[in-house]
Amino acid sequence: MKELKDLIKKAIEIKDRAYAPYSNFHVACVVMTRSGKIFEGVNIENASYSPTLCAERNALSTAITEGEREFSYIVITGDSEYTYPCGVCRQFIREFADSDTKIIIAKDTENYKAYTIDDLLPYSFSKKDLE
């Protein structure tokens, strides 16, 4: 439990690093790999919108670049009550999350909700469908 609260605290701390001059909506994501490594990401907006990088894909891409593929926690926090991943991020998470990966949507260390990728993206298309 302390480990989870520390991850939530970290996400809240880095949220202001987001580059969001157009929406003014700051999102942060902290992921913990099964090996215990922690990676961070924030949303980075772009004037043409489509190249905007969401916090979730930012954090996961950094971890993947460092050779990590298995995740214990994906913690997301934003400027609203509870900030859920967009559809693109849910599909991106689907590629690397398994049924044991906890996806935490947090307002603060006391107010958060825990999900699996199957909760957030039921009936999804995944790499298993291509086997």
Predicted regions and their residues:
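C-terminal binding/interaction regions
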Residues: 2-17, 68-131
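Short, well-ordered amphipathic alpha-helical segments that serve as non-catalytic structural scaffolds
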Residues: 10-13, 55-62
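Short Gly/Pro-enriched turn/cap motifs at secondary-structure boundaries
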Residues: 19-22
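Short beta-strand scaffold segments in enzyme catalytic cores
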Residues: 24-33
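Alpha-helix C-terminal capping segments
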Residues: 32, 62-68, 96
